[in-house]
């Protein structure tokens, strides 16, 4: 047990209170805690019109967030932040749940920093993944004949998937990341994509 050295409730209550206060102060439930507005490069005479359009976009964004599992998962991430680093994964969903969030416990990942001391590599080990779940987890994955046979007929057999997100420094003028998924049973890459743009990293890491 990880809590066998805890002799009173001070730490447990303190972590819960820390996470609750942080959530209510930064990202309160059922509130619009951020706004999309025109930047300084937009001419002043066009800003009002653009801000009105962005206001509608902001409403839609927060409607999606509030109908997702963001509130629950960000609270767990803030609890991790109380004792170290919080990691929140944001992934594309489906028509019912357009966005899915997942709080990733720190023992499940390894973080590495780049030349500017920011986190630029995330290694996540996903254990006990059933082969017949791989298609749902990675819809755009390309399976080798060996893995495809396991996906179709492995039943409840499980594998470990290593996910890696790393910064692409060959594109210095744009924020770009590579995202890999490796099936550790065959040691082969089943999924690879390149993501560009600020916020393209699906792992949000904060300290």
Language-model features: locations:
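Extended, charged amphipathic alpha-helical segments
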Residues: 169-207
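Extended, helix-rich architectural segments
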Residues: 1-160, 166-176
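A detector of the onset of the first functional module/processed chain
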Residues: 161-162, 183
């Amino acid at each position: 047990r990880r809590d066998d050295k805890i002799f009173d409730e001070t730490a447990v209550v303190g972590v819960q209170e820390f996470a609750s206060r942080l959530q209510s102060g930064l990202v309160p439930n059922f509130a619009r805690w951020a706004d999309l507005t025109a930047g300084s490069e937009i001419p002043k005479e066009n800003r009002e019109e653009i801000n009105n359009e962005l206001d509608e976009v902001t409403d839609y964004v927060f409607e999606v967030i509030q109908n997702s599992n963001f509130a629950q998962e960000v609270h767990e991430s803030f609890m991790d932040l109380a004792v170290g680093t919080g990691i929140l994964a944001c992934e594309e969903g489906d028509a019912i749940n357009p966005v899915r969030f997942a709080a990733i416990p720190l023992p499940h990942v390894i973080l590495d920093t780049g030349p500017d001391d920011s986190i630029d590599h995330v290694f996540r080990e996903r254990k006990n993944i059933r082969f017949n779940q791989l298609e749902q987890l990675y819809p755009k994955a390309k399976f080798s004949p060996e893995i495809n046979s396991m996906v179709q007929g492995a039943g409840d057999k499980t594998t470990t998937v290593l996910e890696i997100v790393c910064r692409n420094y060959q594109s210095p003028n744009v924020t770009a990341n590579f995202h890999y998924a490796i099936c550790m049973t065959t040691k082969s890459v089943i999924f690879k994509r390149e993501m560009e743009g600020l916020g393209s990293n699906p792992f949000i890491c904060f300290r």
